[in-house]
Amino acid sequence: MSFATVAEALRDFRRGKPLVVVDDPGRENEGDVVVAASKATPAVINFMAREARGLICVPMLGDRLDALKLNAMVEHGAPREAAFTVSVDAKKNVTTGISAHDRARTVAALIHPSTGPEDLSRP
């Protein structure tokens, strides 16, 4: 297996190409499919759900989480555990929240600067 250079990965990331980022063998020793949130189209979300089959997550800074009132799912986890928040769906232009379209819409809502807590539902 070959790995891309950082420059190649950044170029592809900017273009919206999904990448597999591999962590350290001393941690989980696994790869995560990542894509720029601004490029998370329904087709990309569908690919991630179909091929990677894991949770689709949106990493966010603490200030943004606070602004959206997204609390941690579990307080004070172990240092290497993922810090998940409560799950959310966008309120506008979604149906059940599970389709690729709905998930892409939720990602777009999470990163839009005018989105507030009132624009999200907790399923």
Labelled PLM ranges:
Residues 1-123:
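Catalytic domains of riboflavin
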